[in-house]
């Protein structure tokens, strides 16, 4: 792995400052994968999102409606974390598949085994009135093949728009991956929001989370065009191929790989009911508790040649620019 000095990770898509065309040989690479990596990705993103709402005074007293939540193993960690902080939240977890039994028997968690449609969304809104709703969506349709088709994605995004329109949440975190330009069908609309990047996503995933806080006005929509799709493809490939394969040498942490650096900046925003001498100590505590919960082994930085002594400095981003080749990014998890 190559080394780099960075002040901070790319937290949102708009911050990515370079692009790269796809190199076909990347499809043959053997991807590194942690146990329960998908649950880790979701847990970190949702902990960051909900902690942001907590900081803004939005979370306490809300009902989290999570559509597409199964198996939901990681949700037990989220529930326990905020419960132990004294934050009052109710959880409604909805999926056509069954949830992890670890979520059974909790008074503040309602499990619903069914898929949603417009009629059911209206019944949820009526049932929860006048509670404030926080919406999390991880809906995913695959009518064939290993990844959703563009038609699947457009159907999912239309459903997510209906969720927002009917449930009228105070905030939402939606699944978002732009269709690939070589599979383009038509322009479409998504809610306006911040496009949060995800540490520990699969190696060439182009998926992110669309985060929005609503302040009473009607939902704002953003049009997505084929030109946007080209931009998403190139920037996400640059992030995955170049940035995420770096070791951040000025990052004083047991594992200096970029995804851990990204995780560090997400976890530093999280509240704890303990005090710590340093931010690093808090984040080590949180990481260890998360990894222990998900049965993920703790690892150190690997394959760094001639590593200099760690130093707490900020330096310029030394990543190279303007690489070129051609093909679509593939990876949507």
Curated annotation (Swiss-Prot):
Belongs to the class I-like SAM-binding methyltransferase superfamily. Poxvirus/kinetoplastid 2'-O-MTase family. This is Cap-specific mRNA (nucleoside-2'-O-)-methyltransferase. InterPro entries: mRNA_MeTrfase-like (IPR000176), Pox/kineto_cap_MeTfrase (IPR025804), Poxvir_cap_MeTfrase (IPR030375), SAM-dependent_MTases_sf (IPR029063). One of its GO terms (molecular function) is mRNA (nucleoside-2'-O-)-methyltransferase activity. GO terms for biological process: 7-methylguanosine mRNA capping; methylation; regulation of mRNA 3'-end processing. Pfam families: PARP_regulatory (PF01358). MRNA binds at residues 22, 177-180, 182, 205-207, 233. Its main location: virion. Residues 169-249 are annotated as: Binding to NPH-I. It is found in: Virion. Residues 305-320 have a biased composition (Basic and acidic residues). SUPFAM superfamilies: S-adenosyl-L-methionine-dependent methyltransferases. S-adenosyl-L-methionine binds at residues 39, 66, 68, 72, 95, 97, 116, 138. Its EC number is 2.1.1.57. One of its GO terms (cellular component) is virion component.
């Amino acid at each position: 792995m190559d080394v780099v000095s960075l002040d901070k990770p790319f937290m949102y898509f708009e911050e990515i400052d370079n692009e790269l065309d796809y190199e076909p040989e990347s499809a043959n690479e053997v991807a590194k994968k942690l146990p329960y990596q998908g649950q880790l990705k979701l847990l970190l993103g949702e902990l960051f999102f909900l902690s942001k709402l907590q900081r803004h005074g939005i979370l306490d007293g809300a009902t989290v409606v999570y559509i597409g939540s199964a198996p939901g193993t990681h949700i037990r960690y989220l529930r326990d974390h905020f419960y132990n902080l004294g934050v009052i939240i109710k959880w409604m977890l909805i999926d056509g598949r069954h949830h992890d039994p670890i979520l059974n028997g909790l008074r503040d968690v309602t499990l619903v085994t069914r898929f949603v449609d417009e009629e059911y969304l209206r019944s949820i809104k009526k049932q929860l009135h006048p509670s404030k709703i926080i919406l999390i969506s991880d809906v995913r349709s695959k009518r064939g093949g290993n990844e959703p088709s563009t038609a699947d994605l457009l159907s999912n995004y239309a459903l997510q728009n209906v969720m927002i329109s009917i449930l009228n949440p105070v905030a939402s975190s939606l699944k978002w991956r732009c269709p690939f330009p070589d599979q383009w069908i038509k322009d479409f609309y998504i809610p306006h929001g911040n496009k949060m990047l995800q540490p520990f996503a699969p190696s060439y995933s182009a998926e992110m989370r669309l985060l929005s806080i609503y302040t009473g006005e009607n939902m704002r929509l953003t049009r997505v065009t084929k030109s946007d799709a080209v931009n998403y493809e190139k920037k996400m490939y640059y992030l995955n191929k170049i940035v995420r394969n770096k070791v951040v040498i000025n990052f004083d942490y047991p594992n200096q790989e970029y995804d851990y650096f990204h995780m560090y900046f997400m976890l530093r925003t999280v509240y704890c009911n303990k005090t710590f001498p340093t931010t690093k100590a808090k984040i080590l505590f949180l990481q260890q508790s998360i990894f222990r919960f998900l049965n993920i082994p703790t690892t150190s930085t690997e394959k760094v040649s001639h590593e200099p002594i760690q130093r707490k400095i900020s330096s310029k981003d030394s990543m190279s620019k303007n690489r070129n080749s051609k093909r679509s990014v593939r990876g949507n998890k």
